[in-house]
Regions:
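Bacterial N-terminal signal peptides
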Residues: 7-14
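Positively charged n-region of N-terminal signal peptides that target proteins for export
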Residues: 1-4
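Carbohydrate-interacting regions of secretory-pathway proteins
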Residues: 18-222
Length: 222
């Protein structure tokens, strides 16, 4: 009888141990949980690393990390950002992503992008937190040209941003609302501010602000 009881106790302990082991998550399991689903090659960010990107060496930038399927741009003394290092089109493309402001009072998404052989930047939440527009058009910033508009942005809320670039038009949407509708006039010159030259050809920055980015995609337009 005693041997039988000992055997039963041993069997119970063995079953309990197996259950506990099955509930322990390995580092691979945790990594898989944080990865966003990569449905196709249009995704520029894999959710777990900066593969294809580099931290932009602005100098006084804040820390940059990948956590929970997001690129986190820490608050720096100026620009903090990442630059895409793989091939990028010059025209007829669409970039979409989700961005949120975590802390700070300035832009949480400064997207520098090519327009043919020129470059420009879409600023979301600049100049104190509410300005949206293109920098620069004929040397005028997003706060002072024909694309200037204003929006209130909540901390901790994700905003879906879409940018469509063609030869003579640049359009931007935030949560499906058209916020930039630029049509190039004869003689217009597009350029970028000196602070973000290192973001070329395509990069995303924040300015004195902690920001998070996810679901970054690139699609060709017909």
């Amino acid at each position: 009888m005693n041997r039988y009881l000992v055997f039963l106790l041993f069997l119970c302990c063995l079953i309990s141990s197996c259950r506990n082991r099955s509930q322990i998550k390995t580092s691979s399991d945790l990594e898989a949980e944080t990865m966003i689903p990569i449905k196709d090659s249009s995704y520029l960010f894999n959710g777990v690393s900066l593969d294809g990107w580099e931290i932009t060496n602005f100098g006084p930038q804040g820390p940059v990390s990948v956590s929970g399927g997001q690129i986190v741009l820490g608050m720096g003394d100026g620009c903090t950002g990442v630059t895409y290092k793989k091939e990028f089109p010059e025209l007829d493309y669409k970039v979409s992503l989700e961005a949120k402001k975590v802390a700070g009072n300035d832009f949480f998404c400064g997207m520098t992008f090519p327009v043919g052989k020129e470059s420009c930047s879409l600023i979301v939440g600049g100049w104190g937190g509410t300005t949206v527009g293109l920098s620069t058009i004929n040397r005028k910033d997003a706060s002072e040209n024909q694309t200037t508009t204003y929006m209130l942005f909540e901390r901790g809320r994700w905003y879906r941003i879409e940018l469509l670039v063609r030869k003579d038009t640049v359009r931007a949407y935030i949560d499906d609302k058209l916020v930039v509708d630029y049509i190039r006039a004869k003689g217009d010159v597009l350029s970028i501010r000196p602070e973000v030259v290192l973001s070329k050809p395509f990069g995303i920055t924040s300015w004195y602000t902690t920001a998070a980015l996810r679901d970054i995609r690139l699609e060709k337009l017909d």
